[in-house]
Amino acid sequence: MLLSNVAVNRTVVHTQLVSGSRSALHALSRTSHSVPVTHTHQRRHIFSHKRRLSSSTLAIPFALSNTNSATTAPLQFLSNVSLCRVTPGTITTSAKATAPNLDKMSAEAATTAAQASASPVEDSFLKKAVSCQSETEREAVMAARAAKKALRETKETWWAPYVALTKPRLTVLVVLSAMSSYALTPEAVSLTNLLFLTVGTALCSGSANAINMGREPAYDSMMTRTRGRPVVRGAVTPNQAFTFAGITGTVGTAALYFGVNPTVAILGASNIALYGGLYTTLKRKHIINTWVGAVVGAIPPLMGWAASGGSLLHPGAWCLAGLLYAWQFPHFNALSYSIRDEYKKAGYVMTAWKNPGLNARVGLRYALLMFPLCVGLSYYNVTDWWFVLDSSVLNAWMAWWAFKFWQQENVNIALAAAGKQYSQNPFARKLFWGSVVHLPGVLLLAMIHKKGQWDWLFGPSEDEKKKTLSS
């Protein structure tokens, strides 16, 4: 608390400090003389500027005791966290420490720090001034920093590399395609089935991706796109990646088997084998690897359809699978074109550099195939006929960029044959990002237009009424 009957002179020294803030403060006190104190102000106190002491600006509020009075009261120093007391004595400061001269005073103090000497009282005060936090608060701050650092190190060295092994963004896309198909099935659905389908599909996808990374660190290190993967960086070893893949694959398949049904479990296990085994091997053998990879992408919709007990012989299930299969080509062919030189350097046999014309032509061909596949979903009563209309907008958008990509590639091939220079195909990137938006958009529209979705609001269609009457 502040002591009464102590005459003080309210003085605030606002000193601009850099890393040597303590030295500047010491120099400030050593190069000054005593300031006389009057008795006109009683019970005055000043609170410190609410700013971290580590900042380049430090405000030092302090009160001066009356050294001329018979009774010398202890100096009171009040900060925003604690009250620091200094033993009686003469605390000195510059007689010219007025507001306009503060910056000049701090500069002069810093230059004369090595030539000055200070009394124990002055030194004690300044030490208190620059470290006026309580011990409890300092310990709490240090403990919080240590905990945050430990959490960050734990994340970087323990679970983050294993999450990266699963290729989270790709896994999310795989899970969403399975969930969308599950939502579109005409059979009854349940929350429990959906939960097991989601977890099991995610674990199976993560297992396949971990096997893929564990087998290719030497080649992934040659590509900018893949050199940051955990096995390449040494965050996990290939054996650890394979162990992780074995655990997640086993748990994922078991979740699908016991929580959904054996058909879905078989499809999940086959996807691990196709992606982690056949596709990864073919990447360095033949361009057919892209078609095998597309089959891998087509399996999750079949898993979602079968999860509700729907028959895999239903044409609607294969329209959904075909949708995912066809989408792979404009998406991946545009992606691989942009980094075709890196694929070639790493030894991956991709159509983008083996046969650029075929690469662009295949991308356009399968982009156009999206139109009849969406019509098929309506024809086989998976969606209503309005889906054909609005899905055609997204299909036309992606098909347009696929066409421009193919057209420009033909021009580039002609220029190369004539021995002329040509620039990078600018439509590859546009097609890639167009495909990223296209697939979620089409799946969302399909769920909105699911057959019978809006019968509660608009009533059943004429076809549904005829079916009801005939039955």
UniProtKB/Swiss-Prot annotation:
One Pfam family matching this protein: UbiA
Protein task: Converts protoheme IX and farnesyl diphosphate to heme O.
Keyword field: Heme biosynthesis, Membrane, Mitochondrion, Transferase, Transit peptide, Transmembrane, Transmembrane helix
Protein's name in the database: Protoheme IX farnesyltransferase, mitochondrial
GO annotation, cellular component aspect: mitochondrial membrane; mitochondrion
Similarity remark: Belongs to the UbiA prenyltransferase family.
UniProt source species: Yarrowia lipolytica (strain CLIB 122 / E 150) (Yeast)
Lineage: Eukaryota, Fungi, Dikarya, Ascomycota, Saccharomycotina
Transit peptide range per the UniProt entry: 1-60
EC number, UniProt record: 2.5.1.141
Catalyzed reactions per annotation: heme b + (2E,6E)-farnesyl diphosphate + H2O = Fe(II)-heme o + diphosphate
HAMAP family: CyoE_CtaB (MF_00154)
Membrane topology designation: Multi-pass membrane protein
